[in-house]
């Protein structure tokens, strides 16, 4: 999902990538728990 937004004009790509990683980490943590 994050790869669909590729405009480093204002660094939005970085934000989307961080959000995607954050969701994945939360999912992993939830599965682990």
From Swiss-Prot:
Record's bilayer topology term: Multi-pass membrane protein
GO biological process entries: post-translational protein targeting to membrane, translocation
Top-rank taxon: Eukaryota
Location in the cell: Endoplasmic reticulum membrane
Location, primary (coarse class): endoplasmic reticulum
Cellular-component GO terms for this entry: endoplasmic reticulum membrane
Keywords carried by this UniProt record: Chaperone, Endoplasmic reticulum, Membrane, Protein transport, Transmembrane, Transport
Tissue expression notes: Pancreas.
Disulfide bond entries: none
Its job: Mediates cotranslational and post-translational transport of certain precursor polypeptides across endoplasmic reticulum (ER). Proposed to play an auxiliary role in recognition of precursors with short and apolar signal peptides. May cooperate with SEC62 and HSPA5/BiP to facilitate targeting of small presecretory proteins into the SEC61 channel-forming translocon complex, triggering channel opening for polypeptide translocation to the ER lumen. Required for efficient PKD1/Polycystin-1 biogenesis and trafficking to the plasma membrane of the primary cilia.
Subunit record text: The ER translocon complex consists of channel-forming core components SEC61A1, SEC61B and SEC61G and different auxiliary components such as SEC62 and SEC63.
UniProt-recorded name of the protein: Translocation protein SEC63 homolog
Upper lineage: Eukaryota, Metazoa, Chordata, Craniata, Vertebrata
């Amino acid at each position: 999902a994050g790869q669909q937004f590729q405009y480093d004009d204002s660094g939005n790509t970085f934000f989307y990538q961080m959000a995607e990683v954050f969701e994945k980490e939360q999912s992993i943590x939830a599965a682990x728990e």
